[in-house]
Amino acid sequence: LRNNQDQLRSESYQGLMDHLAVQDVPQDQQHAVSRRVILPSSFAGTPRSMQLNYQDAMAIVRKFDKPDLFITFTCNPRWPEIVENLPPRVVSSDKPELVTRVFNLKLQDLMRDITEHHIFGRVEAFVYVVEFQKRGLPHAHILLILQEMYKPKVAEDVDQLIRTEIPDPDTERELYDIVVTNMMHGPYGVLNPVCSCMVDGKCQKDFPKPFNSKTQFRSAGGYPAYRRRDNGRAALVRNRELFNDSVVPYNPYLLLKYNAHINVEVCSTVKSVIYL
């Protein structure tokens, strides 16, 4: 505690008292405000904590250059480790401690694959955060900065890491099932106007994506236009047919190993840091 007073100190919130004076709060009621404490940056989730984490991430980017890959890893409540340990008539949302523990172990394994087994190449630096969705499922946002020789610089490099097409069910049946279950966006649009992504009649995630015969880097920055061939291959999702223009970018190895929603994107700017 003695060595971390800058992070742990509290101070009187005089600004609040000044605000009350401006708002003409009666003097006899102002004393009830008493002393206010500013939560320290060590208190996770507070504005000071989020600002500090953002500044730390930007410091890493300044030293090691912009991120190369942005990965979103979401917990799958149907993982056997969760389902097999649920008591009778209990669902995963009733056991957040079980879900969180399993997800944390999977996340540690994923980070070992990335940083020790070098599935994307050798990593120069990385940063990640873990968040909880409204329905209680944890997910992690991971930024990777690769060593220079492993950075995806041309379309062929991107195609080796990322797919945005429905696999062939005859030759890659297991991968096909995982993609259809976890990596299809929708149904949305006219197929499902009440989808959560729909605002003013338009998908906020910009689906459907345009078909492309080859991957192209965009001069304006952001994510590349991935290869999405219009080969007619379809997947049935909630009784609706979806095509390659509705596939969320993924890495086949990670999907086969972790059987979860794992969105893998190539970064072109530092804007992805704001998602942390």
Regions picked out by a protein language model, each given a short descriptive name:
Residues 1-275:
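Extended, structured polyanion-binding interfaces
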